[in-house]
C-alpha cells in the first residue's frame, strides 16, 4: 500500500476518533441532568456515538434500527425514573407547620 495513502487513512481515522470523542463528551454533559449515574450516562453516550458512526452501513441498518428503538425506550424509562425521583424528593421536603412559622416570626 502506498505510504501516503496509509498516512491519509490514519489521519482520517485520528480526526474521526477525536471528533467522535468530542461528540461523546458533549453528549455526556447534556445527559447529566437526565442520567445522574456516570457509568450509565457514559454507556448511553457511547451507544449513541456508535449508532451515529456505524449505522450508515447498509448491512447494519436493521440491527441499528432495533438498537435505536431500544435505546429510545431506555432513555424514556430513565427520564420517567428521574421525574419520579424529583416528585418524590419534593413531596418529602419537610414542611413547617403554622405554629413553627409563627414561633420563628416572634
From Swiss-Prot:
It holds the Pfam family LRRC37AB_C. InterPro entries: LRRC37 (IPR015753), LRRC37AB_C (IPR029423). PANTHER family: LEUCINE RICH REPEAT CONTAINING 37A-RELATED, LEUCINE-RICH REPEAT-CONTAINING PROTEIN 37A. This is Putative protein LRRC37A5P. It comes from Homo sapiens (Human). The gene is LRRC37A5P.
Amino acid at each position: 500500500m502506498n505510504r501516503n495513502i496509509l498516512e491519509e487513512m490514519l489521519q482520517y481515522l485520528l480526526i474521526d476518533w477525536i471528533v467522535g470523542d468530542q461528540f461523546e463528551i458533549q453528549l455526556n454533559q447534556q445527559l447529566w441532568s437526565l442520567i445522574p449515574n456516570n457509568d450509565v450516562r457514559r454507556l448511553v453516550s457511547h451507544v449513541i456515538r456508535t449508532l451515529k458512526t456505524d449505522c450508515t452501513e447498509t448491512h447494519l441498518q436493521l440491527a441499528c434500527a432495533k438498537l435505536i428503538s431500544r435505546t429510545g425506550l431506555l432513555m424514556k424509562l430513565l427520564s420517567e425514573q428521574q421525574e419520579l425521583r424529583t416528585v418524590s424528593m419534593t413531596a418529602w421536603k419537610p414542611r413547617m407547620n403554622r405554629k413553627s412559622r409563627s414561633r420563628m416570626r416572634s
